[in-house]
Amino acid sequence: MQWEVVIGLEIHTQLATQSKIFSGSATTFGSEPNTQASLVDLGMPGVLPVLNQEAVRMACMFGLAIDAEIGKRNVFARKNYFYPDLPKGYQISQMDLPIVGKGHLDIALEDGTIKRIGVTRAHLEEDAGKSLHEDFSGSTGIDLNRAGTPLLEIVSEPDMRSAKEAVAYVKAIHALVRYLGICDGNMAEGSLRCDCNVSIRPKGQTEFGTRCEIKNVNSFRFIERAINSEIQRQIDLIEDGGKVVQETRLYDPNKDETRSMRSKEEANDYRYFPDPDLLPVVIEDSFLDTIRAGLPELPPQKVERFQSQYGLSAYDANVLASSREQADYFEEVVKIGGDAKLAANWVMVELGSLLNKLGVEIDQAPVSAAQLGGMLLRIRDNTISGKIAKTVFEAMAAGEGDADSIIDSKGLKQVTDTGAIDKMLDEMLAANAEQVEQYRAADEAKRGKMFGFFVGQAMKASKGKANPGQVNQLLKAKLEG
């Protein structure tokens, strides 16, 4: 039987506010446990929550960016459940009247096509604290620094049909919230976490199968692996005569499998009711107009502009616009270096390889946009060849200065003097007289392969400094003359 996969995602995005959603406590990551928890965060009697307007503004920014309906009247609700790191015994969230309603986000698939993914809603809520198991023998520690950190939970429609589509959607959300500046997107620190709802159904069936939720997956790679593992588990289970049970599961990356965590709760299990300590929040049109006017250029618009303005392919434009920092870096290089396609190649390939090797983001790149742009100028004016440029790039990455100083100090300037190249070629051909005779006696097909040998010998003789274009032109004339 052929199976169709149905995937919906819930993405928990920590908003980059300076203080928590209902208290004035700081939200700095990595502070000593329980040093950023106020009486409000601790759920002490008699204290009252006060809504952080910046969290509301950031949620509205996201809603406008995905062309969503913004809830003009917002009500906060208590989501009741017991967990050791939830001091109040309930979480303040939104149920019936979320701040962001239906919207959509377009994702680029591997074949270059664009698919629209529906966003059901996005609502504001407070994060819980954190249980610490590894540092305590036979017991669990509770860190409430995270309790009360503002979250925007983004709920998608079940529109994805493969793990790769799901990853593309999460990457698009990740890029968007970073462009907007509402989340740092640091998945390792838990700033962006994903719950994956996965089900299967026979191909052609319209009714959904029983879904399982994989909780708190925190990397693109693990999202893909977790979903694929769960898909295979459900297929094997049904084909062996079993039945999928609706439940919450965890992904174990070491065993590459999901395991049962608990039965899946429904909304009525949490006994939602309006929080009596928080008045409804009314969002006025003037507030939204101000936010709309301040929105930055978003990834889809930037991709379109990169193609029209710089003549880049759709693939290159999507890669370069995948983060705001990378897009800004690329444009700064183009501003100095002039050639957009050359800049795109160096940013994506050479710089990308360097950043992967160092394990850092582009805002920590050891080669600045000004340095790279300056080096590309020297390629364009034939001061250095593309091959020598790699040596210059490595030296810049090692902190040896800008392109011009490295070229001068290492004597890397390209030889463009026709007389000097002509003399060098004569000496090289004289030293390889036998190969010259073989070349001249060969047919056209063999000559093509043999020509590369002479080019290699010429570049070796010049220590890579001879202008490759001039070498090719003069060499061809000499061999066929």
Curated annotation (Swiss-Prot):
InterPro entries: Asn/Gln-tRNA_amidoTrfase_suB/E (IPR017959), Asn/Gln-tRNA_Trfase_suB/E_cat (IPR006075), Asn/Gln_amidotransferase (IPR018027), Asn/Gln_tRNA_amidoTrase-B-like (IPR003789), GatB (IPR004413), GatB_C_1 (IPR042114), GatB_Yqey_C_2 (IPR023168), Gln-tRNA_amidoTrfase_suB_CS (IPR017958). It holds the Pfam family GatB_N. This is Aspartyl/glutamyl-tRNA(Asn/Gln) amidotransferase subunit B. Heterotrimer of A, B and C subunits. SUPFAM superfamilies: GatB/YqeY motif, Glutamine synthetase/guanido kinase. The lineage of its organism: Bacteria, Pseudomonadati, Pseudomonadota, Gammaproteobacteria, Pseudomonadales. Its EC number is 6.3.5.-. GO terms for biological process: glutaminyl-tRNAGln biosynthesis via transamidation; translation. The keyword Protease does not apply. It comes from the Bacteria. Allows the formation of correctly charged Asn-tRNA(Asn) or Gln-tRNA(Gln) through the transamidation of misacylated Asp-tRNA(Asn) or Glu-tRNA(Gln) in organisms which lack either or both of asparaginyl-tRNA or glutaminyl-tRNA synthetases. The reaction takes place in the presence of glutamine and ATP through an activated phospho-Asp-tRNA(Asn) or phospho-Glu-tRNA(Gln).
